[in-house]
Structures are given as structure tokens and as C-alpha cells.
Amino acid sequence: MRLSLFSALLVLGSLVSAGELRLATFEADVTPPLGSPLCFNFIKPAATVETPLTARGLILFSEEKPIVLCVADFVVIANGSHDAWKEALAAAAGTTPDRVAMHVIHNHDSPGYDISASAELEKQGLKDVMSLREAHNQAIADTADAVREALSRSAPVTHMGTGTGIVEKFASNRRIIGENGKLEMARMSSCRNEEIIAQPEGTIDPELNLISFWNGETPLAALTFYASHPQSYYGRGGITPDTVGLARNRRSGETGALHIHFDGAGGNVAAGKYNDGSPEARALLVKRIHAGMKEAWEHQITSELSDSEPGWKTIPTQLPWNSPYSVGELTSQLSNPDSDTKTRIRAARDLVYHRRWKEGGKIDIHCLQLGNARVLFFPGELFVEYQIAAKAMLPDDFVAVAAYGDGGPGYIGTEVSYGQGGYEVGRVSRTAPGVESVLNGVIENLLATE
């Protein structure tokens, strides 16, 4: 018989009262129906399901309230949608939303959800034009059910493992800066221009970081983190978790433990140098990311966690607003029936985030600590420089980074990048150059030792 939430939490309370760390994993199918808009309706809608999409994660139980880590195979979850996911998963796990890290892997052949923007579009008679509200609600409900069902099958965590693999010939920086300090070339997720392909990889983090949890010799779950856009090709109507999702699924089967992958600070990083957008290139990229996952697993170092208490810090943070358009211009774009649908969708997304910022809204940025391992959980499409800086702050410890949490801010560049120009710091970024000083302070505070 299925335990009620109250009964399950009572059982868990008796198990962790002596300081024992326990873990439960969960997974739900969140594949949208055929015909669903994909990538906020900026590409062809869903015509086939190549590989189902999942929301998967784990719950850590200790003497404190549970911690929930979840990542969904969506391109974005933003604003009110991000709040809705955190609230639902927190309620299901018997914890509070500030102890939930909700992320996406940013695969483009998937839905993007932002119920705040959808509400503004609905006022203009544009219901379900950006995403399907019912599919979104169903995905949340099914994932929350999976969390509740996981409560009765938690297992003790006796050991934790940390490992690092090097991913070869996958990532390259999207932004090629000229001698004048301005963007000279853009190298996105795929590229066939030989001159652009020939440019150096640029600033990337080649490390794939892994944290695993064990009950004796039995693996319970694996978390991996790698900084790059995951796209090989997209926009052909085939629903898929793309490169990292396919490699992740394969590793789950090989290890017997649920594999949960987070996209790191890959806002300005993609596979363009090594990807021509062909199916053959996708297969090769999957092979390379899989090799990095496997290497990290095989080279991990395990340590006992019998008396460990997971540390969890949260810093609510307001990021400085930026847009090339005034609020009046955005309002006109949204309300003008002669504007194309994509323009109206962009305007709705910009306006709801501006309103949130103006009202003083903040985004939770988290740090999970287990032994000498720390994981930082960030919003938006964070530039890789933040990840590199975070690791440099604690060079003797294990530091991993997950980005693509709340997608409200869009791209989050460095201070210098906004003056260089380019796609990532144009309309798709809702943050100002001062964001770097804000985030550097947050990182320092989260990584500071007690």
C-alpha cells in the first residue's frame, strides 16, 4: 500500500534521528504531447518522440529538512513556472522551497515553461502559443507524485564518491573576440564555416565533475556536471534530451544507479567547433560526453559519510536588470496584433521578468556541501568564467557548478562581455554588466568556510 506523506515522513524521521544520512531517487516521464510547441515556439513543434523526456533527481534526508535536487529535460523553466516546480516538490518531500534546486538540461527539442509569461500572452488571446499549460501542470504533478512515492524507499548513504573526467572535442567558446576587443565571430551549437571552425576552442572548462552516493558497495545515484550547451541539431520536430541526456541514460543502465546530469555554466559554450549538425556528429558527441562520464566514475575517490550532515546555504539574490528596450516598447510589442508571434513571446518574457525585478524579486542561489565537496546551483545561462572562478576559489576542494536553474534572467555574462557585443549579451540577457560583481560576492559567501 502506498504510504501517505505524513506516514512516510514519520518513518523517515525515526530513521534519521541518529544523524544518519539517507537518500531516495525519483524519476518521472515529462514528455509533452505531439503538437506541443518546442523551445518557446521558436522551432518546429513536436512531431515525433525520439527519446522520452524525464524529470529526475534525489532527496537527501538528515536531521534537517530534506534537500531536493531535480533536473528536467526542458529548455527553460522560468519565473512563475520555476516557483511552481519548487513549491510542488517541496510539498511532496516535506520540506521548504528554499531547499529545492530545480534545473533543466537546456535541450532545445523540448518545451520551455514560464507560466508568468503565458498569462500575459493569454490576456492577448494567445493561449498555449508558447507552451501547453496542461502539459506543464501534468509534468509538475507527475514529478511530485514520483517524489512522494520515493519517500518510502530511501536508503542509507554510507559513502560518497567524487571524480573528474576530461571531455575531449566537445565544447568550444561561442564568442571569438577580435583584436579590437569586440566580438568578431560567433560559433554556436553547430558550424560549417571552416574559418570559424579553425579558431581555438577558447575559454572552456573541459572537466566533467561527478558526485556519487553509495550504500556500502551499492551505488544509489550519480550527479554529473559539465559546462556546455548540449545541442547537436534541433528544430526538426523530434523530441529528445540530446547529447547529454542520451549519454546520461546510457550511464544509468551501465551503473545500475540513477544518473542525474546538470548543465554547468555553459551560456557562452557550445559544440560548434566539433559539430556540423549532422546525425553522425550527434552520435560522436554522445560518445565523447559518455566517455567523460565514464572516466569520472572510474576514477572517483570514495569516502565514508556515516556521521556527515549535508550543509545547505541559500542566498536570495537580486540581479541587475538590463534590456535594449524600454518597458513602453516591450508593452507595445506584446499588445500589437501585427507583431509576429515570436516578438510577442519575447516581449512577454521580458516584461514579466522586469516586473519581478522592479518588485524586488530575488532568486535563490544555493550551495550543497558534503565533506570537501561543494555544488553551486545558479539561475540562467551563466557564462563559463563564473564556474572557472568558483573552482579557483577553493583549489584544494571539489567544486561543481550547475546553471540553468530559474531561466528568468536569460544569459548572464561577465562585465567585460557586455561591451564586446554579441548575441549572448543582447536581448536574450536580462542582466546588466554589474551582475558580475553581484555574483562574485555570492560565490565567495557560499564557498566561505565556517
Question: Residues of each region from the PLM?
Answer:
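Glycan-recognition surfaces in beta-rich domains, encompassing non-catalytic CBMs
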Residues: M293
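Anionic-ligand-binding alpha/beta catalytic cores of soluble enzymes and soluble regulatory domains
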Residues: I289
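Catalytic histidine-centered segment of alpha/beta-hydrolase-like enzymes
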Residues: V269
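Bacterial N-terminal signal peptides that target proteins for export
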Residues: M1-A8
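N-terminal signal peptide c-region/cleavage motif recognized by signal peptidases
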Residues: G13-L15
